[in-house]
């Protein structure tokens, strides 16, 4: 069986590397995706990636995917998007939620997530390495 993971990155993550590096780090999104692609390839898993600032594009990608696992950094949509939550529940694909920063150590409005209670797990505060942790966990579950 071919295993596939869909990696979703939400709004403003295209600015990684130059947007508030003290919070989000210096790596670009392209750097992060390249590292994850190598990790996935080494495990024999296909990695599909989408980044969008438009909620509907992320929802359409969720609806269209044939992946068996999703890793999502919903970014600002974490705190606002019931539609993204409904899309994930609608396709019934297990997912991990990832955040570069520790959202619980930031402004109170960032503490609430519409996705966390439905995620397999939530990884936050480890910077770009959080994606690697999520992918390792996804691969382990896919290969179990």
Swiss-Prot record:
Which InterPro entries does its entry note?
Answer: DHquinase_II, DHquinase_II_CS, DHquinase_II_sf
The biological processes this protein is annotated with in GO are: amino acid biosynthetic process; aromatic amino acid family biosynthetic process; chorismate biosynthetic process; quinate catabolic process
Pathway connected to this protein: Metabolic intermediate biosynthesis; chorismate biosynthesis; chorismate from D-erythrose 4-phosphate and phosphoenolpyruvate: step 3/7
Catalyzed reactions: 3-dehydroquinate = 3-dehydroshikimate + H2O
> Keyword annotations for this protein?
Amino-acid biosynthesis, Aromatic amino acid biosynthesis, Lyase
- Give residue numbers for the site Transition state stabilizer: 19
Q: Where does substrate bind?
A: 73, 79, 86, 100-101, 110
Which residues belong to the signal peptide in this entry?
Answer: none
- What does the record give under GO molecular function? 3-dehydroquinate dehydratase activity
Query: Is NAD set as a keyword in this record?
Result: no
Q: Which Gene3D superfamilies match?
A: Dehydroquinase, class II (3.40.50.9100)
**EC numbers on record:** 4.2.1.10
Could you name the active-site residues?
A: 24 (proton acceptor), 99 (proton donor)
Q: Tell me the subunit arrangement.
A: Homododecamer.
Q: What does this protein do?
A: Catalyzes a trans-dehydration via an enolate intermediate.
Q: Which HAMAP family match?
A: AroQ (MF_00169)
- What family, per the record? Belongs to the type-II 3-dehydroquinase family.
Which protein, by its recorded name, is this? 3-dehydroquinate dehydratase
From which organism does this entry originate? Shewanella sp. (strain MR-4)
Lineage of the native species?
Answer: Bacteria, Pseudomonadati, Pseudomonadota, Gammaproteobacteria, Alteromonadales
The coding gene here is: aroQ
